[in-house]
Design a protein with these regions (language model features):
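N-terminal secretory signal peptides that target proteins for export/translocation
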Residues: 1-4
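Bacterial N-terminal signal peptides
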Residues: 7-18
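Histidine-bearing beta->alpha loop at or near hydrolase active sites
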Residues: 77, 236
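Residues at alpha-helix caps and immediate loop-helix transition turns in enzyme cores, especially N-
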Residues: 51, 84-85, 239
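Flexible loop/turn segments at secondary-structure boundaries
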Residues: 20-23, 174-175
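Alpha-helical cap/lid subdomain in secreted, periplasmic
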Residues: 31, 88-235, 241, 245-264
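Serine-esterase "nucleophile elbow" of acetyl-processing enzymes
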Residues: 23-75, 90-102, 120-126
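Structural motif
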Residues: 79-88
């Protein structure tokens, strides 16, 4: 065999490992990034309306940003159902890596009828039952699941990718009765806790933690500083900061939750 022919035979053997190595730096860069906390939820977590702020924005300042990234992927008007059906969760999953974290808080937009024009209600509870409904927004048939099913789906998907899932009960509204904040302990707060337990996820009872904090502060201050004059659901910056602090309080109280190790002292 001539030297020229021998060189042609060896060329593919040389090129294949070289081209494979060329792709490694991009993959390595992706794998070597800081652990990331992804936050998903509704407008009480992230809000673009003037004067309204969700807790998912100020909470980033409570983490050591030299050790973790905090990305708020919550979106106003979304429910546990529509965060999945609109493809928002799929985008989070595409970026999620082993060692990352997901905090989720849904519930405020999950009520109503399944064929409501906004197409966002889930079945009440945590069961596995389904119901066929026509999505009034898209005009398409849709299999609707329970609130708890959607939370378990998010937690299960996150865990399958090696990430840690934390489920929060929804923040309380500025609604009081006989000097006490109205809780969600008989519906979405309860169901969030049950879903976390069955999914093997961590649970922060944010509804209860914040309600107690509001009661300590007092109804007048809560109304004057933490909410808008005509809105009992969405918080001001001060309210969002207080709620973010309550999320951190809940994280610190969890046993063996690795996310707490990334908080500022």
């Amino acid at each position: 065999m001539s030297i020229s022919i021998l060189r042609l035979c060896l060329l593919p053997m040389i090129l294949i490992p070289t081209s494979a190595l060329a792709a490694e730096p991009a993959d390595a860069k992706r794998l070597d990034r800081l652990p990331t906390l992804f936050i998903i939820g509704d407008s009480t977590v992230r809000n673009s309306t003037k004067g309204q702020v969700g807790w998912g924005d100020p909470i980033g300042d409570l983490f050591d940003k030299s050790t973790i990234r905090v990305i708020n992927r919550a979106l106003g008007g979304r429910s546990s159902r529509t965060y999945l059906t609109e493809g928002l969760w799929e985008k989070v999953l595409a970026d999620l890596q082993a060692g990352d974290f997901v905090i989720m808080q849904f519930g405020h937009n999950d009520g109503g009828g399944l064929s409501d024009p906004r197409g966002r209600a889930s079945i009440k509870g945590t069961g596995d039952e389904t119901q066929e409904a026509t999505n009034a927004r898209t005009g398409e048939k849709e299999t609707v699941h329970s609130y708890g099913w959607y939370l378990r789906r998010y937690a299960g998907d996150a865990k399958a990718k090696g990430a840690t899932a934390i489920i929060c009960s929804p923040i309380p509204r500025n609604i009081w009765k006989e000097g006490k904040v109205a809780r969600a302990s008989n519906d979405y707060g309860k169901w969030a806790g049950e879903s976390a337990k069955s999914a093997g996820a961590f649970f922060v009872d944010l509804n209860e933690i914040i309600a107690k904090r509001y009661e300590d502060v007092g109804q007048k201050k809560v109304a004057d500083e933490y909410f808008g004059a005509t809105d009992h659901t969405h918080t001001t910056l001060a309210g969002a900061q207080l709620n973010a602090g309550c999320v951190v309080e809940g994280l610190r109280g969890l046993k063996d939750c690795p996310l707490a190790g990334y908080l500022k002292p």
